[in-house]
Amino acid sequence: MTEPKKEIIEDENHGISKKIPTDPRQYEKVTEGCRLLVMMASQEEERWAEVISRCRAANGSIKFYVHYIDCNRRLDEWVQSDRLNLASCELPKKGGKKGAHLREENRDSNENEGKKSGRKRKIPLLPMDDLKAESVDPLQAISTMTSGSTPSLRGSMSMVGHSEDAMTRIRNVECIELGRSRIQPWYFAPYPQQLTSLDCIYICEFCLKYLKSKTCLKRHMEKCAMCHPPGNQIYSHDKLSFFEIDGRKNKSYAQNLCLLAKLFLDHKTLYYDTDPFLFYVLTEEDEKGHHIVGYFSKEKESAEEYNVACILVLPPFQKKGYGSLLIEFSYELSKIEQKTGSPEKPLSDLGLLSYRSYWSMAIMKELFAFKRRHPGEDITVQDISQSTSIKREDVVSTLQQLDLYKYYKGSYIIVISDEKRQVYEKRIEAAKKKTRINPAALQWRPKEYGKKRAQIMF
């Protein structure tokens, strides 16, 4: 294929290539599946991107929805044609994706729909100076529906049926207003089409009902009697609270919560049957009520021992330590249940960072505490798992990721260098100043859902 001609001028002062506008008809060749360099607005540099969709504006120009290669899909965006580097365009291979259907830009039409365990083995804790290991620095969701219209009825969030349907790869909501915050969503969420065609969706921060205008929101707030999430307040400390919400008893709230979360989670499938799930909503309290900052959900009965199905901190409240707080709370519940738990996989990139950070700190604290309580004694991975409620596989993977798990003279040992010990002791001390879960403020007892069902059947 002959590449389209493009005139380039060298800037005399900076030597930067400038592109002279090309014939608009040349952009007709750029179809779904094409890869080319695109000027990324957030970084002001060209990056390789794949064209997901395109549409024609009323003035006849074409704009393209692109996914930047090797970047998270929350960075996907609509771009004008002048940000494309046509000289770099690579057409999709034969047998690949079909070309995109060009649509007329209409806020009430299809464009917006598209935007639419082994044996217990004692592991010796070697003296800090016996062996040296390299220093390792530890780290800090509902993808698409199975179809573009009607989701299956299974559970609120699930990995089943993760789809790459082009329509659901396109962010279909431009903006939401939740409380005092206006937020740009990251991913597709199946809100009603008549709302996704609007510039902004307005959401009540207490009941999470979605409305089409500021006026409708004001009218709703005059009637809405809620000033906190439904369900039971099971934790309250330092103006932070957790509310436990049964997905069967509070279906409307649970479904609205899942829709809201889908805007910011990409690795799970959204379903409308919330009955099998419990939701734990974290709130900040002020004179007006309890304002949602994040949540996690879990299955009432999980054969895989998952203690978290989905977890999310809303963007305005990120980087405040709330992610670690949600994770810590989920493990406090597991400790009361006397079970080990693990989050449902896969985790988002941000979720994985948060979990690795929590696991690292929790495991290191337990190792140091064990060393003080039982000097000279050995510890097993199972011991660590039971004391922290972190599943055995996650304990092992964390020790390996920190380069602490070594094979030595026929058995596995945990090796902590003086350097690492000092680093983690400082981090543990610094963590004491951060917001933490106070177990004494947690008023909760686990429910045996399986036993109740068995009694009813009997």
UniProtKB/Swiss-Prot annotation:
Record has tRNA-binding as a keyword: no
Broadest EC class assigned to this enzyme: transferase
Cited InterPro entries: Acyl_CoA_acyltransferase, Chromo-like_dom_sf, Chromo/chromo_shadow_dom, HAT_MYST-type, MYST_HAT, Tudor-knot, WH-like_DNA-bd_sf, Zf-MYST
Enzyme Commission code: 2.3.1.48
SMART domains: CHROMO (SM00298)
Domain MYST-type HAT: 168-446
Knockout consequences: RNAi-mediated knockdown suppresses time-restricted diet-induced lifespan extension and also the age-dependent decline in locomotor activity. Reduces expression of transcription factor daf-16 at transcript and protein level. Reduces expression of superoxide dismutase sod-3 and of hsp-12.6, but not of eat-2, daf-2, pha-4, hsf-1, and skn-1. Reduces resistance to oxidative stress. Reduces acetylation of histone H4, drastically at 'Lys-16' and modestly at 'Lys-12', respectively; does not affect acetylation levels of histone H3.
Keywords, alphabetical: Acetylation, Acyltransferase, Chromatin regulator, Developmental protein, DNA damage, DNA repair, Metal-binding, Nucleus, Stress response, Transcription, Transcription regulation, Transferase, Zinc, Zinc-finger
Residues holding acetyl-CoA: I311, L312, V313, Q318, K319, K320, G321, Y322, G323, S324, S348, S357
Record keyword Transferase present: yes
Modified residues (N6-acetyllysine): K268
UniProt-annotated catalytic positions: E344
Changes after translation: Autoacetylation at Lys-268 is required for binding histones with high affinity and for proper function.
Coiled-coil region list: none
Localization (cell): Nucleus
Gene Ontology cellular component list: NuA4 histone acetyltransferase complex; nucleus
GO molecular function, one term: histone H4K16 acetyltransferase activity
Biased composition (Basic and acidic residues): 101-116
Alphabetized PANTHER family for the sequence: HISTONE ACETYLTRANSFERASE (PTHR10615), HISTONE ACETYLTRANSFERASE KAT5 (PTHR10615:SF219)
Function text: Probable catalytic subunit of the Tip60 chromatin-remodeling complex. Plays a role in acetylation of nucleosomal histone H4 and perhaps also H2A, probably acting as a component of the Tip60 histone acetyltransferase complex. Acts in the determination of vulval and distal tip cell (DTC) precursor cell fates. Involved in the positive regulation of transcription factor daf-16, probably acting by histone acetylation; thereby modulating stress resistance.
Family per similarity comment: Belongs to the MYST (SAS/MOZ) family.
UniProt subunit comment: Interacts with transcription-associated protein trr-1. Probably a component of a complex with histone acetyltransferase (HAT) activity, at least composed of mys-1 and trr-1.
Protein's UniProt name: Histone acetyltransferase Tip60 homolog
Protein species of origin: Caenorhabditis elegans
Gene name in the database record: mys-1
